[in-house]
Amino acid sequence: GGGASQAQISQRNLELLDIYNAEIWHQITKNWAFSQEMGGGHANLEAVIIVKIMRDGEIRDVWFEKRSGNSYFDDSAHKAVKKSNPLPPLPEGFLKPFYEVGFRFNLSELERHP
């Protein structure tokens, strides 16, 4: 048949997801309010949050894979994700019922998104 191979479909999905990830990360960081003073001057704080996104962009679940150890920092990252609900719908070619993705929150990321 003249259909696309599984590898081509996967490659296209990865490209779509890269674009989607950049889009939703931009949306989340816009909602991220954190001041370094409140973090007690720790420049190396980092938290990893996993987000479960439904096909329509609804955030169904949010949990920490790794906490920073600073509750103010962790709360600010968690709130940024919650505030971003709903996200844009998943890309057309993405066939699974939901998408789970991890976001790494750290202060160097925050500085890059003024």
Stretch-by-stretch model annotation:
Residues 1-48, 54, 58-63, 71-75, ...:
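Compositionally biased, low-complexity segments enriched in charged/polar and small residues
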